[in-house]
Amino acid sequence: MSAKAEHYDVIRKPIITEKSTMASENGAVVFEVAIDSNKPQIKEAVEALFGVKVKAVNTTVTKGKVKRFRGQLGKRKDVKKAYVTLEEGNTIDVSTGL
């Protein structure tokens, strides 16, 4: 499957935190994805961009906090994260760029 332009719109960037590093030991990779993307789109994009087989996709939406900026109330953006579990024997090196 070849990578299409819309696959780059679905997958924004890899998330490298302590929690995602622990998840990578169990064969999972964490990505920030478009807020309107769904699990089948995320699975298709990861398989096309990285050439791996995806076992499961779990998603979370973190709501943006309300913060003050120069006395004005503002809201940070909502962030959607996808925990992508890979099939046995497949790996993704997230330190390389998309």
UniProtKB/Swiss-Prot annotation:
GO terms for molecular function: rRNA binding; structural constituent of ribosome. Gene3D superfamilies: 3.30.70.330. InterPro entries: Nucleotide-bd_a/b_plait_sf, Ribosomal_uL23-like, Ribosomal_uL23/eL15/eS24_sf. GO terms for biological process: translation. Keywords: Ribonucleoprotein, Ribosomal protein, RNA-binding, rRNA-binding. One of its GO terms (cellular component) is ribonucleoprotein complex. HAMAP family: Ribosomal_uL23_B. Part of the 50S ribosomal subunit. Contacts protein L29, and trigger factor when it is bound to the ribosome. Belongs to the universal ribosomal protein uL23 family. One of the early assembly proteins it binds 23S rRNA. One of the proteins that surrounds the polypeptide exit tunnel on the outside of the ribosome. Forms the main docking site for trigger factor binding to the ribosome. This is Large ribosomal subunit protein uL23. It comes from Ruegeria sp. (strain TM1040) (Silicibacter sp.). The lineage of its organism: Bacteria, Pseudomonadati, Pseudomonadota, Alphaproteobacteria, Rhodobacterales.
